[in-house]
């Protein structure tokens, strides 16, 4: 039979993350931008350190049976801008492409908060977070307000996803969780991310 599953997935003092992240940003390497002038790009090792320190992993069991496994990353300002740097080096962006991507990212940071979710559910019929008729609900509580997520399934090639999220594997589904609240608000408070939905029990 089916029973509702409610998980308080992430309850984190986001401001504590920022202290670690900002220290990493202060020591960025100067890397030549391909097809353009030198710009201050984050190195791969610095980016991997940031994403590792802002990712939480958990397995949920019913007895000995695995119900789901997730890895979730808070895409705060340093990580989001770091992803632009990583893509610039990987895909050989010109300086104008780099500036356009950076501008788009900065605009999104003002409008919304994003998380990356790598989700594995053995019973695949429940892996439908992005469908209109899904039973799953995802909430972000921050600054005394609750926001509901829009879940978007990432359809990029596995290797492209792993370039930014090396912990993601081919057995899991990649999602972007988008909340209509500025990233700066989430960064400067304590946020709780809650996932509720159906699950076999």
Spans of features found by a protein language model:
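C-terminal motif of bacterial Sec signal peptides marking the signal peptidase cleavage site
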Residues: 21-24
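Conserved functional micro-motifs across diverse proteins
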Residues: 26-201
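Bacterial N-terminal signal peptides that target proteins for export
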Residues: 2-14
